[in-house]
Design a protein with these regions (language model features):
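A short acidic, amphipathic alpha-helical/loop segment
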Residues: 22-26, 124-128, 201, 205
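Metal-dependent polysaccharide deacetylase catalytic core of the NodB/CE4 family, i.e.
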Residues: 28-125, 130-135, 142-155, 182-193
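Hydrophobic "anchor" residues on beta-strands that sit immediately upstream
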Residues: 10-11, 73, 215
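Active-site metal-binding loops of divalent metal-dependent hydrolases
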Residues: 13-16, 78, 190, 220
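Glycan-processing catalytic domains of CAZymes
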Residues: 11-12, 76, 136-138, 147-171, ...
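C-terminal domain-boundary segment and adjacent tail
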Residues: 1-2, 29-31, 40, 104, ...
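Boundary/entry segment of secreted carbohydrate-active catalytic domains
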Residues: 1-19
Length: 227
C-alpha cells in the first residue's frame, strides 16, 4: 500500500506555535514526516496566551513558515480556532474555507486536511468540511490501535504523545506482523513539551519509530491517500 510496505507512521501537530521549530528540526533529523494544522487568522507572534501552568504560548509569524515546514504537510485548523459546533453553518463554512484559501496561498500547496479545533465536531460540521473540499479531519479521540480510518473526516489518532502507554503501543506496532495495513498516528501540540519539560520523551518516541526499512514515513495526506 505504501510503496509495497504494510506499515506507516505519521504525525499531526496543531496551532503553529514557536515550539514547532524545535519539533520540525527533530523530525527532520530522524527522517519522519508530519502534518501541521494552522489557524491562518491567528498566525502572529503577538497572538499569545498563558497556559494554566504559567507558560506563555506564542504562535509564529507567517514569515519563514513555508521554509520551516518544507517537506511536511500544511492542513487547516480553522481561521480563528473556532469551536465549530457552537456556530451557524455560514460561520463554520467561513472558518474552514478562509483558512484553507489563506494557507494554500501562503504555502503554495493544496490543503485537503484539517484538525478540528478543540477536537469538537458534529454531523453538520463534517458535512460542511466535506463540501469545503476537506478530505480528512483529525479528532482527539484515541484508538489505541493501528487500523486505517473508515471515515477520514472523523480520523481518530492512535494516541497522544503524552499518553501513558505510548511506548507500549510503539512496541506493539513494531512487533505486529498483521497482513492488514498498520498505521501509527501520533498527535499533540509542540508547546506541551515545554509545559511538561519532556522533550526527551519525543526524542525517545522518534528513536523508536524511525529508521525501519519496512515502515513508510509520510504526511497525513500521503499515508491516507498515497499522494
Amino acid at each position: 500500500m505504501w510503496n509495497g510496505k504494510k506499515k506507516a507512521v505519521t504525525f499531526s501537530y496543531d496551532d503553529g506555535v514557536t515550539q514547532d521549530r524545535r519539533l520540525v528540526e527533530m523530525m527532520n533529523t530522524y527522517g519522519v514526516k508530519g502534518t501541521f494544522n494552522l489557524n491562518s487568522g491567528m498566525q502572529s507572534y503577538a497572538n499569545v496566551w498563558e497556559h494554566p501552568k504559567g507558560l506563555l504560548i506564542h504562535r509564529m509569524n507567517t514569515e519563514g513558515l513555508k521554509e520551516l515546514y518544507q517537506g511536511h504537510e500544511i492542513a487547516a485548523h480553522c481561521l480563528t480556532h473556532a469551536d465549530l459546533p457552537k456556530y451557524d453553518e455560514e460561520t463554520i463554512c467561513n472558518e474552514i474555507l478562509e483558512d484553507k484559501k489563506n494557507l494554500e496561498e501562503r504555502f503554495g500547496q493544496p490543503v485537503v486536511g484539517m484538525a478540528y479545533p478543540f477536537g469538537t465536531y458534529n454531523d453538520t460540521v463534517v458535512d460542511i468540511a466535506r463540501a469545503c473540499g476537506i478530505r480528512y479531519s483529525r479528532t482527539v479521540e484515541r484508538t489505541g490501535n493501528f487500523g486505517l480510518p473508515e471515515e477520514p473526516l472523523t480520523l481518530n489518532p492512535t494516541c497522544h504523545h503524552n499518553d501513558a502507554d505510548v511506548m507500549d503501543l510503539i512496541d506493539r506496532f513494531l512487533a505486529s506482523d498483521s497482513e492488514e495495513p498498520q498505521l501509527f498516528y501520533l498527535w499533540g501540540h509542540s508547546y506541551e513539551f515545554d509545559v511538561d519539560q519532556n522533550w526527551d520523551r519525543m526524542e525517545e518516541i522518534l528513536k523508536k519509530l524511525s529508521g525501519h526499512d519496512e515502515i513508510f514515513y509520510g504526511t497525513n495526506r500521503e499515508v491516507l491517500f498515497g499522494e
